[in-house]
Amino acid sequence: MTNIVFMGTPDFAVPVLRQLLDDGYRVVAVVTQPDKPKGRKRELVPPPVKVEAQKHGIPVLQPTKIREPEQYEQVLAFAPDLIVTAAFGQILPKALLDAPKYGCINVHASLLPELRGGAPIHYAIWQGKTKTGVTIMYMAEKLDAGDMLTQVEVPIEETDTVGTLHDKLSAAGAKLLSETLPLLLEGNLAPIPQEEEKATYAPNIRREQERIDWAQPGEAIYNHIRAFHPWPVTYTTYDGNVWKIWWGEKVPAPSLASPGTILSLEEDGIVVATGSETAIKITELQPAGKKRMAASEFLRGAGSRLAVGTKLGENNERT
């Protein structure tokens, strides 16, 4: 039987690991990122993949730097015939890439060569795409640049968020892997090189990218909000204080004003001018130091002092 080492870290990777086990493959070890401190008490929390592996009694390795010989040699000690990765979070060294009989394959959440990198789901929505997908490909030393084995398209709905699309792609990736592995192990797949000139990139999200730029068209701001929902969440500022913007809707602008201007205060939201004739109605927000709430609740309380004509985003420095 084929010895498989699975490498993955976040929730996205869990259905992929489960699929391997459900299909009866022998997963001899799981490699994931180290536990991380979270919350106010900074208690160490294990990655979701570690939790899943421990449910099945699978040995778990948590290297801090997989490219260090003493760390990747622990993986090689399990004599993998195949390494399967899904959102692992570290680039593998050549010694690992070359070792398995069937190679190293990766489940990547985009239609490669588009959206290489660590945040392809965010960028697919942020860029207003109507479809994305999953690619299973051989791993190479260059990030997400290996030859492709299989691919499946997944439509992006108008109301999809990074959360809903994440779950769709994770499920699609698990199913695609289930269909791909028998063909790979039987030698019935012809790898397809990626077209480098068509490559685009989706690097990890930076904190400053969470800020809403009200000068952008309303459609782009709507895509930004849903691309960052429910993590890491967009924000704007009002009177020097941060407002996290959890959700908003596109609405026709009732009047023209400079971007960021509050155009109207409605029962269910705050309508804000953008760089186009499409305004954004903020329907769910989290003012600094407060809980997440519906805009209607906010407007009945602390937001009752808001006035039409006030500007959002004047102080763009996040505190």
Swiss-Prot record:
EC numbers for this chain: 2.1.2.9
Keyword Transferase: yes
Record: residues binding (6S)-5,6,7,8-tetrahydrofolate: 110-113
Keyword Cell division tagged: no
CDD domains to which the protein is assigned, alphabetical: FMT_core_Met-tRNA-FMT_N, Met_tRNA_FMT_C
Molecular function terms from GO: methionyl-tRNA formyltransferase activity
Pfam families the record matches: Formyl_trans_C, Formyl_trans_N
Catalytic activity line of the entry: L-methionyl-tRNA(fMet) + (6R)-10-formyltetrahydrofolate = N-formyl-L-methionyl-tRNA(fMet) + (6S)-5,6,7,8-tetrahydrofolate + H(+)
PROSITE patterns: GART
GO cellular component: cytosol
Keyword terms, alphabetized: Protein biosynthesis, Transferase
Family under the similarity heading: Belongs to the Fmt family.
UniProt-listed NCBIfam families: fmt
Purpose of the protein: Attaches a formyl group to the free amino group of methionyl-tRNA(fMet). The formyl group appears to play a dual role in the initiator identity of N-formylmethionyl-tRNA by promoting its recognition by IF2 and preventing the misappropriation of this tRNA by the elongation apparatus.
Name of the featured protein: Methionyl-tRNA formyltransferase
